[in-house]
Amino acid sequence: MKKTFTFLFLFLSVVGFAQEVDLEAIHRIKQEGLNNSKVEEIAFRLTDASGPRLTNSPGYKRAADWAVQQLTGWGLKNATLEKWGDFGKGWQIEKSYAAMTAPYYFQISATPKAWTGGTNGPIAGEVTLLAIEKEEDFKKFEGKIAGKIVLVKSGANTNPTFEADASRITDKELEKMAKQPIGASSRYTPEMIAQYMARRAFSRKVDQFLINEKAQLVIRGRNGKHGTYFTSNGASYSADAPPAIAELETAPEHA
């Protein structure tokens, strides 16, 4: 039995080393990837040229139409768009501008929150800082924010930073990543998930409070630093969803 096993092992080893490498094919693959790549052009057409591409938005349609046209131009047959189901409302920014006018003029970097409402033209109003962190805080603002611009403070860290924004992964870190088990358990514990769900529920309650109290506009500070901030969606895209209050997101330094 031992001899049979040794024979098979040697036979497989010989076959493995006998395979010839097609260097010409490898060269052509490298040539296409390194010198003839269209990745940058494709990315430009789908992003900068098409604009924001929320589902069912005009920007999404522009990007999809370009993709069909490009695929057809490359020789693919029957490149078409197919409807996959009923999504809901589309959304896009038509015009957006925000500024502080007193005690002096200051332009604010702010972006409308996806699927929130508009203002139907320029608006102005008194600004109120909303600080609701627990149930007892709601009483403090009842009847005090109607028709006002409500500023919701950001929880982001705005302290100065002294480390580079980017860094290279060391060989030791790469070795540790390579040894990480496949399918390793989530870094989020049940307690962390429960806390996240509780924060989401409380945030929705605050949103409904702002609607009930008839705030004119909401401005929220978002996570980010050095003037860069991350945007998100703030309302339902369902076709039958009620209109949402107008809402902007701004850099944490402004909130």
Q: What residue spans do the PLM features occupy?
A:
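Loop-rich non-cytosolic ectodomains and luminal regions
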Residues: 190-194, 198, 202-203, 207-255
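Solvent-exposed, acidic/flexible segments
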Residues: 22, 32-40, 53-64, 121, ...
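Sec-dependent N-terminal signal peptides
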Residues: 4-14
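N-terminal capping segment at the start of a domain
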Residues: 21-57, 225, 230-236
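Positively charged n-region of N-terminal signal peptides that target proteins for export
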Residues: 1-4, 19
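Extracytoplasmic/secreted proteins, especially bacterial periplasmic and envelope-associated proteins
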Residues: 24, 28, 38-41, 45, ...
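A gly/proline- and charged-residue-enriched helix-loop-helix capping module
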Residues: 175-199
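Noncatalytic luminal/extracellular "stalk/propeptide" segments of secretory-pathway proteins
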Residues: 20-21, 44, 48-184
